[in-house]
Regions:
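Polar/charged low-complexity regulatory segments
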Residues: 1-35, 94-139
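Alpha-helix boundary/N-cap detector
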Residues: 8-15, 19, 39, 43, ...
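Amphipathic alpha-helical packing elements
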Residues: 33-76
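Aromatic-residue detector
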Residues: 47, 89-91, 124
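Amphipathic protein-protein interaction modules
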Residues: 59-115
Length: 139
C-alpha cells in the first residue's frame, strides 16, 4: 500500500490539489494505504473541493476518466469558480497552517500521539505531520 504524495506540492498554484488527485488515482487502483480511505472527499479534500466550487464525486469521475493533472486543472477551472491569485494565497495560507493554534489543534495532537509522534514539537501543522508520518523528511 502506498501513501499519498506531499501536501506541499502545488497544481495551479494550490497546495494539496496534487495530493487529492493522487489519492483518487491510488484508491481506484487499490494502492492507497487504508488509513486514508475514510478521509476521501473529507477533511482537506472536501474543503479544497468546496473552495474550488466543485463536487468531490465529479472530481473523482473526471480524474478517473484519465488525463494529466494539468488537464484536470483545466476541467476544474471550467467547472468551478474562477480563482484569483489572492484566492490561491488565502487557500495556501489556510491549508499550510491548519492545526497550528486553531480549532484543528486538538485533532492534530491526537493524531501525533496515536502515531507515536507526540514528542515532536516541530510538527505544528497537519502538513508537517503528514510529511513525517508518511515517511518524508520534515520541511
Amino acid at each position: 500500500m502506498q501513501r499519498p504524495i506531499s501536501a506541499f506540492l502545488k497544481l495551479g498554484g494550490l497546495y494539496f490539489l496534487p495530493r487529492t488527485l493522487d489519492k483518487i488515482r491510488k484508491h481506484a487502483r487499490g494502492e492507497l494505504h487504508a488509513e486514508h480511505h475514510e478521509y476521501l472527499g473529507k477533511g482537506f479534500d472536501g474543503r479544497l473541493c468546496h473552495f474550488l466550487g466543485i463536487d468531490y464525486a465529479a472530481l473523482t469521475t473526471r480524474t478517473l476518466a484519465g488525463g494529466t493533472d494539468e488537464e484536470i486543472l483545466a476541467w476544474i477551472q471550467q467547472n468551478g469558480r474562477t480563482l484569483t491569485e489572492v484566492d490561491a494565497m488565502i487557500w495556501n495560507g489556510f491549508a499550510a497552517k491548519r492545526g497550528w493554534r486553531d480549532d484543528a489543534t486538538p485533532g492534530l495532537e491526537k493524531n501525533k500521539a496515536d502515531s507515536g509522534l507526540a514528542h515532536r514539537t516541530d510538527l505544528v501543522t497537519y502538513f508537517d505531520y503528514y510529511e513525517v508520518d508518511e515517511g518524508r523528511a520534515p520541511r
